[in-house]
A protein has these predicted regions:
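Alpha-helical secondary-structure segments
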Residues: 112-122, 171, 175, 255, ...
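Surface-exposed binding/hinge segments that line
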Residues: 136-234
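Extracytoplasmic/peripheral linker and loop segments enriched in polar/acidic and small residues
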Residues: 22, 365-366, 370, 378, ...
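N-terminal lobe/hinge region of extracytoplasmic solute-binding protein
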Residues: 37-91
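Structural transition elements
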Residues: 385-424, 439-444
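Ligand-site clamp/hinge motif
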Residues: 123, 244-247, 273-320
Length: 601
């Protein structure tokens, strides 16, 4: 019998650090080759795993993987009908039909078939798993042997766990029926890793069509022995270390294909001659390097050994770029930095601290947020790195930077208003606020200093909280240790579910313990919404409830920079040009449109 989900793995904060071996680096005499440098390494080609959704992996996948849909900066689903169609054929129950276009082909020449979708459903629905990962305080898996012995895709999706029935296949179509409404139905399922490669690796079937069919048969028959091998291959065969040894398994559907993986150092992509969709490759080869420090990236640009560099946006980096002859430099914004207030840790903002008086706790939260000098944070900390920076007023950045509307308009700190709220609430003693923050980041450290100074005028004693187990683990597992978290909030691959999971009472990622009747009513309505045109209004209602309750405050988007060699560069004309490259926002869940400069049309 197919069963409901037993577990869900949610990545809240990704801190990626990977070492690697070295090989000879690309040389400047590289006709037809574009070299990109970034600060995040590629770790997996499997977008169903946490490693595959890490920023460096998302960057690579967005160029080598095509599919039914991509996600733009605003969280909107962008359909690619050249790959196939996604149709909602019924609302009750929610039923979605996928039809694969005959032109959709893997880079080894094998056609894309419903077997590829069926494999992804099996992996992400959790219906076939019979063992769940056990994690330590750092989020590391501790029961690898049990996972290897059982059926453990270990990648249940909050959306696909609601698709509990075995999908039906008819020719080039696969039909999925959900047990409950799923607002993210447009992006919940897509082609990910190739079923035929998994079948060849896990089941030893050589012929691609027969290998894909064998995977489908194992899923339909619930063959535990075969599924154990299939789930293990799905989970590990597309990691960087595995692909470094077997790059032939890095089969893809997009305009480029993976040709070489050097873990922790670089990935080399080549033109995919089997690709027949829009936006074909405009270079013979694209090399993405992650082995250079920020200033080394600038040096590579100056030397002509890199064409596009995306180093960390710091004053030193910008000054160095100013010295590069002919460099075209663009700055922009990435993930939104927010102050999220802990309401369940028996601390400064928890009603329990005030004898259970929710109104007093709300007043303290509102007062603290009024002391935050957002205009000064932008002008003094961020604008020197990104002159166009503005105060971020939308509260739901996991959907997109403008999701939820401008519910918290910008302005200077309102010290008088904050003092009045505390007086009316009868709070006369100083309030200590422990802030969970990465103080090794100069940007956030400078922001915290301004927040501390302003809040002190009202009687808030702001102190940085040093994480014990790490920023991510303490964000999730130590609610009684901090009162506010100053954290970047990246976009989610399931934008609407991310709002539900984060803000409704008892949500899987509700790390601040937020509970509020208005928020719950708004998220309940959002959870029932399957009309994409109705989503904006539902998100606005959620955001308004959060603003009214003093749950969270958006500050500003993190500054980012990208630089390319302009026409005045000494090396111009000797290596490929990379025009119109936008700043690289690695906090996005999908970077397909960022790669427009590397594609035709």
């Amino acid at each position: 019998m197919f069963k409901g989900s037993r577990f869900g793995l949610v990545a809240l904060v990704a801190l990626v650090a990977v070492g690697g071996c070295t090989q000879e680096t690309p040389q400047p005499d590289r006709t037809g080759t574009a070299v990109v440098t970034v600060g995040m390494p590629f770790t997996s080609l499997n977008g169903g795993t946490a490693e595959g959704r890490a920023p460096g992996s998302t960057l690579i996948r967005s160029l080598v993987q095509a599919g039914f849909v991509s996600i733009d900066e605003d969280g909107t689903a962008v359909l690619d009908e050249g790959f196939g169609t996604v149709e909602k054929v019924s609302d009750a129950p929610l039923t979605v039909r996928y039809t694969i276009d005959p032109a959709a082909t893997w880079s080894d020449g094998t056609p894309v078939t419903p077997a590829d979708l069926l494999l992804e459903w099996a992996a992400r629905s959790g219906q076939l798993d019979d063992v769940a990962p056990e994690l330590d305080a750092q989020g590391e898996i501790t029961n690898d042997d049990e996972l290897d012995a059982g059926v453990a895709f270990a990648a249940a999706s909050p959306a696909l766990v609601q698709a509990q029935q075995l999908p039906t296949v008819d020719g080039a179509t696969l039909t999925l029926v959900y047990a409950t409404p799923v607002p993210d139905w447009q992006v919940a399922l897509d082609v990910n890793v190739p079923a035929h490669v998994v079948g060849q690796s896990a089941l030893g079937v050589e012929d691609p069509a027969e290998a894909a069919a064998a995977v489908s048969t194992a899923i339909v028959d619930e063959n535990k022995e075969a599924l154990s091998a299939i789930s293990g291959a799905w989970r590990t065969d597309f990691d960087a270390d595995a692909l470094a040894q077997h790059v032939d398994q890095a089969v893809s559907t997009g305009p480029y294909a993976v040709d070489l993986v050097v873990p922790g150092e670089r990935v080399e992509l080549v033109r995919n001659d089997e690709y027949d969709g829009e936006g074909a490759a405009s270079f013979d080869r694209v090399v993405v390097r992650s082995d250079l420090e920020p200033l080394e990236q600038v040096e590579a640009l100056a030397a002509g050994s890199a064409d596009v560099v995306a180093p960390t946006d710091t004053r030193d980096v910008l000054d160095a770029l100013d010295e590069v002859t002919g460099a075209d430099v663009r700055t922009g914004g990435d993930s939104t930095l927010q102050l999220q207030l802990q309401t369940a840790g028996a601390g400064a903002f928890d009603p329990a601290t005030y004898g259970g008086d929710a109104a007093v706790a709300s007043a303290v939260r509102q007062a603290f947020l009024l002391t935050v000098p957002r205009d000064a944070l932008v002008a003094n900390v961020v604008a020197p790195l990104w002159p166009e920076a503005v105060v971020a007023s939308a509260l739901l950045p996991t959907v997109g930077p403008d999701a939820g509307g401008d519910v918290a308009p910008s302005g200077p700190a309102d010290v008088a208003g904050a003092r009045g709220l505390l007086e009316d609430a009868g709070v006369t003693e100083p309030v200590t606020v422990q802030v969970l923050v990465n103080t090794t980041d100069p940007l956030r450290a400078a922001m915290l200093a301004l927040i501390t100074e302003s809040a002190a005028e009202v009687g808030f004693e702001v102190e940085p909280y040093a994480p014990v187990d790490g920023l991510g683990p303490d964000l999730v597992g130590a609610p009684d240790a901090w009162d506010a978290a100053l954290v970047p909030v990246p976009q989610s691959d399931l934008p609407l579910d991310s709002v539900l999971s984060r803000w409704r009472t008892g949500g899987a990622t509700n790390v601040t313990g937020w509970t509020d009747a208005a928020t719950d009513a708004a998220t309940t309505a959002l959870a029932q919404t399957v009309d994409p045109d109705a989503v904006e209004g539902q998100l606005a209602a959620v955001a308004e409830s959060l603003d009214a309750g003093g749950a969270v405050l958006s500050l500003v988007r993190q500054p980012i920079v990208v630089a390319t060699r302009g026409s005045a560069a000494p090396t111009a004309g000797t290596t490929p040009a990379a025009p119109d490259v936008e700043p690289l926002a690695l906090g996005r869940a999908d970077l397909t449109d960022w790669w427009a400069w590397a594609r035709t049309g």
